[in-house]
Amino acid sequence: LEITVVGSGTVLPELERRQSCVVVETASETLVFDLGSGAVRGMLRAGIDPFSVDRIFFTHFHPDHTVDVVPLLFAIKYAAREPRDRKLVISGPEPFHRFWAALTNVWGEWMVGDYPMPTVQLPLACRVPVETPDCQIFWAKTEHRPESIGYRLEAAGKTFVYTGDTAYGESVVALARNADTLLIECGAPAGGEVPGHLTPEGVARIASESGARRVVITHFPAFLQTDLAAEVRAAGYEGEILTAEDGTKFSP
């Protein structure tokens, strides 16, 4: 797996940080997790071909995690170098079908192309993982919106977890259990509180309790661009800590 943080920012508009988007390139597929504003151009800047996407997964339905699906599909339909015939699978948490129906009711004429585009509604409790040619994808409820979930990818003995937006929760700890890399949000300042988001102390708690070996901090606004890694370390996490920027790449 090669993982690229295409968008490390938040709802706050910033020149240097796009909204949430993570691309996972496997041996045979390109997977995208969330598509916030600026994600499509962010893929280009990171050296990723937006037309190569095979699967899209959403963590929840806030615009800063979903809005660029419209320009992506618009581009695939009208601007691809060759007409697409390859399947594009789009998945999201229950009630994803309702969200998708509303979106396509407005934009469908310009989004839906002449290629297979199945949509998959994931129940909030993962019973059977999504099987791809190269990895298994599990998910679990997170503490942000009623529909919010995070994802866990397992491939070739390595585990990568992406929380999406969340506060502390036992299900989040379980999702991140013994992960090689935990990509985790930090939308609240040290000692502060923003409902549905984590402080550096919360990041450290989840990372420590789960036994994650490495933490990559993402989804933080400009006013939190202090030394987040030092704050997470001071809160008790002893593993490796990285702070994501747009274009940060790593393997689990």
What are these regions (language model features)?
Residues L1-Y162, A167, V172-A174, A229-P252:
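Binuclear metal-dependent hydrolase catalytic cores
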Residues A167-F250:
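Cap/insert and terminal regions of metallo-dependent hydrolase folds
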